[in-house]
Amino acid sequence: GCSHRIGTPSTRLALPEITIGLFPDAGATWFLSQMPRHWAYFMAWTGCQLNAQDGLVVGLIDHLLDYTEQAAILECLTNEVWSADGEANKLRLSQILQNAASDAKDFPPSQLIAHEARIMAVMDQVLASEKPVSAFFTAVDDFADDKFLARAANGIKRGSPTTAHIIHE
């Protein structure tokens, strides 16, 4: 990982392993293990694309920065007197990014938050079942009425069953 994870209005995040038949690598596995369980399984089983606001929700992004702040941030970073103390530099960088943080009004809204109740209900039911992968495969049939959820459902429907089972293990 990195020390300061930044999202912009055009940020796109995904875990496409399900769609290409691979298993999540050590980095993805670590990040998934740090997330709330329902988000981790939903993301890994669907390969859904997330935006910066979603990244904040699942803990993959720390700061939202608008493009309009880029020049000012670069100037601030260039003019900063950095020390030999790595921890002090991290703290100072955090302060700079926090000061420049966007109020996110120009960012696309979180799709995860918009669909949280529905995703949580499905994931709670699926993860409590004896065969979670099969249960999720069936449960996503109910996602057809929503563009974001239908696209997410296609991830597992068209993805690798082997990868889905590896993700569950």
Q: What residues fall within each predicted segment?
A:
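Short, functional N-terminal and low-complexity linear motifs
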Residues: G21-F23, A40-W45, S134-F136, N154-R158
